[in-house]
């Protein structure tokens, strides 16, 4: 069994696969491509892990990773917009219909690339995710992506040193197994319900669209932080 974590090569964050074996060698059942984290073959739609199983087993792990980052950064987490569960068709072809979950975009402050590396190793080792990163920009920012290409799950992190970083995750289009009833009637938990104990706040001002500073975790009132804004901290994100 392998686990996807953040590792380091030449001083730069990369996503790697740590091989859990006695001597650290690639198992015979694993190809070199798999060991290097290259894309897996896509599973036929009907054979993918169901959306219900994703919501029960996979999404809580990803939310736990976001929680751990927020706790490392002081206990607050911003969000924009709300999480969604929508009907989808496989690759938009209209051939097979299923359901797609997308988390809200979540914002955390005061975390470093080393924090992300360490927390990913602790929280995400049980997921079959493999990943890539963009080249590091001059300001040290990175885009990190990891996913289960066989079933369509993906997580994306926009890391900005010294400012707030953002992440979101989604399931990809998956079949329903019916175990949670009619999904048209299913109500997703709110961000506050997903992250009890954290200070949850809207990431942007409703009127101006400007980034909101994280509230004080002691009072719940808006705080002052030079890590809450900046022209680049939402690069690549849907507004």
Name each model-derived stretch.
Residues 1-16:
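N-terminal export and membrane-targeting signals
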Residues 2-6, 24-68, 133-239:
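An acidic-aromatic pocket/loop used at catalytic or ligand-binding sites
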Residues 69-85, 126-136:
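Short secondary-structure junctions
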Residues 73-104:
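A glycine-rich, hydrophobic loop/mini-helix early in the fold
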Residues 96-143:
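Long, charged/polar, surface-exposed segments that mediate recognition or autoinhibition
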């Amino acid at each position: 069994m392998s686990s996807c974590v953040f590792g380091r090569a030449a001083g730069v964050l990369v996503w790697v696969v740590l091989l859990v074996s006695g001597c650290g060698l690639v198992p015979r059942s694993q190809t070199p491509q798999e060991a290097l984290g290259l894309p897996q073959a896509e599973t036929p739609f009907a054979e993918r892990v169901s959306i219900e199983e994703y919501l029960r087993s996979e999404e809580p792990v990803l939310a736990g990773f976001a929680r751990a980052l927020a706790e490392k950064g002081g206990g607050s987490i911003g969000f924009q917009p709300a999480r969604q569960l929508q009907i989808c068709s496989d690759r938009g072809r209209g051939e097979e219909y299923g359901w797609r979950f997308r988390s809200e975009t979540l914002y955390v402050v005061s975390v470093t690339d080393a924090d992300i590396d360490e927390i990913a190793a602790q929280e995400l080792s049980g997921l079959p995710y493999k990943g890539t990163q963009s080249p590091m920009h001059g300001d040290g920012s990175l885009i990190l992506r990891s996913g289960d290409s066989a079933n369509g799950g993906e997580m994306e992190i926009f890391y900005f040193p010294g400012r707030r970083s953002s992440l979101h995750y989604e399931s990809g289009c998956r079949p329903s197994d019916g175990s949670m009833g009619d999904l048209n009637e299913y109500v997703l938990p709110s961000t506050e319900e997903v992250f009890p104990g954290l200070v949850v706040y809207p990431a942007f001002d409703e009127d101006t669209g400007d980034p909101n500073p994280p509230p004080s975790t002691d009072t719940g009132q808006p705080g002052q932080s030079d890590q809450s804004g900046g022209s680049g901290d939402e690069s690549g994100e849907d507004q």
